[in-house]
Amino acid sequence: WNEISDDLGQRFEISFNTYKPFACGIVIHPSIDACVQLRKMHQLQAADIAKVTIRVHSLVLELTGKKTPATGLESKFSVYHSCAVGLLYGQAGEHEYTDEVVNRPEVTALRARVEAIVDDRIDEAAVDLTIRTTDGRDLHLVVEHAIGSLERPMSDAQLRAKFVG
């Protein structure tokens, strides 16, 4: 019973809410964040990418393991689709989760090159991403906490871009 009354009037759960930068399930956010970061760091284009390997917590595949979504709604539950649009477009907003985008040839082609592996060492808020480029390089990034998390909240500029454009 102490759990109910501990910190009563001092701790407010609402203060632990954050804004989601991406229009999909929260467990996918670290993967998108990593894809967007590597895309920007290395000016990646889809033609540069031979394979994408994400090492994730088991919950990621349990909740968002849909490999070939057919609709915008299904794509919101696909870590594969989310990685593909993050790499292709550098974002994963509402527009990237539409029926039209899900079926674009460049999206389906890149989505097919994404491999997700469950790794018990990875926290549900993290991802270990490796991109193998067509010229043989391995680009690697670990994201412990995605943008939009309590540990890495969105900046005012990012919030303006999300809501105002």
Task: Kindly give the residue locations of the regions a language model identified.
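Terminal-appendage/accessory-domain detector
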Residues: 1-165
